[in-house]
A protein has these predicted regions:
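Proteins that catalyze or organize thiol-disulfide redox chemistry
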Residues: 1-130
Length: 130
């Protein structure tokens, strides 16, 4: 189920809800391009304060210590986009992937492969990335 915001964002994406263990950076297309150019594996996740599925994932699988440890060991960077107010940069990223709303999770492997993850995340699914 995709959710759509009701008010436009006045500013660019900011990080507000990333689980502390993942050390997420704010999503920008430029930062994603930099990480991909350096062949760094990246998990991009788009969230919103009003998205219940997002919050379940953030308090569950994304907050799990095993996920944080696996990402650290594998050098996986995390970029979080906050779509709470309908940020147009995030809207464009979502639309480019045929998505109408959040949650949205995409893993970019070091070899360039892109994998869209399910809307409900699991610890096993996340620790298997990379």
């Amino acid at each position: 189920m995709a959710l759509i915001p009701t008010a436009p964002a006045p500013v660019a994406a900011t990080t507000t809800s990333a689980p502390a263990g993942l050390m997420a950076q704010p999503f920008t297309p430029a930062r994603l391009a930099e990480l991909r150019a350096s062949r760094t594996p990246v998990l991009v996740y788009m969230t919103a304060d009003w998205c219940l599925t997002c919050k379940v994932n953030e308090r569950g699988a994304l907050a799990d210590a095993a996920v944080a440890a696996a990402f650290k060991a594998k050098g996986i960077a995390v970029l979080e986009g906050d779509w709470t107010r309908g940020d147009p940069v995030i809207s464009q990223w979502l639309q480019a992937r045929g998505r109408a709303g959040v949650p949205a999770y995409v893993f970019y492997a070091a070899d360039g492969r892109e994998t869209e993850l399910p809307q409900i995340l699991t610890v096993g699914g996340l620790t298997a990335l990379g």
